[in-house]
């Protein structure tokens, strides 16, 4: 039997803290995903609203190409992809990295894409660990989103309190 809780224990919490800090300090955040991972991108965007954090989810390949030109240093692009096979993501990371954009990849497969990004989270693959064809890696993505959101909420609140203290001085 596959236990998602056991699988999630393999995720490095230091990486989550680093990614949360990177997102909280970003000028702009773009969250990318296609097909089912597009739903993960949208879910993360919706959940960010809960903590008052603004970001844009993009699930269309044409829009992903168009937004590359406007990204600069201080911006962060987070890509959700279960298999990291989409060649558009490789080209996108290559292009935006030249402008100093920070890239984060969240995936269930160890590929060259994670080596090209600044940060990555390698999630366990339920699909690969199970004999059932009905298990989908999106469940792991959604659980990860909640873990990252909890850490990000802490960072956003920490930044907000720091700004308030500076205003009082």
Which residues make up each language-model segment?
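HTH-adjacent hinge/linker in prokaryotic transcriptional regulators
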Residues: 1-15
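Amphipathic alpha-helical segments that line or abut small-molecule/effector binding pockets
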Residues: 2, 17-20, 146
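Residue-level recognition of alpha-helical structural elements
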Residues: 12-15, 97, 160
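Glycine-rich phosphate/diphosphate-binding loops that line cofactor/substrate pockets in enzymes
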Residues: 14-26
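Glycine-rich phosphate-binding loops that contact phosphosugars or nucleotide phosphates
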Residues: 25-143, 147-156
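A short, charged, Gly/Pro-tolerant segment at domain boundaries
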Residues: 158-169
């Amino acid at each position: 039997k596959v236990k998602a809780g056991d699988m999630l224990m393999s995720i490095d919490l230091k990486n989550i803290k680093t990614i949360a800090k990177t997102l909280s300090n970003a000028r702009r955040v773009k969250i990318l995903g296609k097909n089912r991972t597009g739903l993960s991108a949208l879910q993360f965007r919706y959940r960010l609203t809960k903590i008052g954090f603004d970001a844009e989810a993009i699930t269309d390949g044409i829009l992903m190409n168009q937004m590359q030109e406007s990204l600069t240093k201080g911006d962060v692009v987070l890509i959700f992809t279960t298999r990291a096979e989409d060649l558009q993501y490789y080209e996108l990371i290559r292009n935006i990295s030249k402008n100093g954009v920070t890239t984060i990849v969240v995936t269930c497969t160890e590929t060259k894409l994670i080596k090209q990004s600044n940060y990555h989270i390698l999630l366990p693959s339920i699909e690969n660990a199970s004999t059932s064809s009905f298990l989908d890696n999106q469940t792991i993505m959604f659980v990860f989103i909640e873990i990252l959101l909890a850490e990000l909420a802490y960072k956003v609140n920490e930044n907000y309190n720091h700004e308030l203290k500076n205003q009082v001085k």
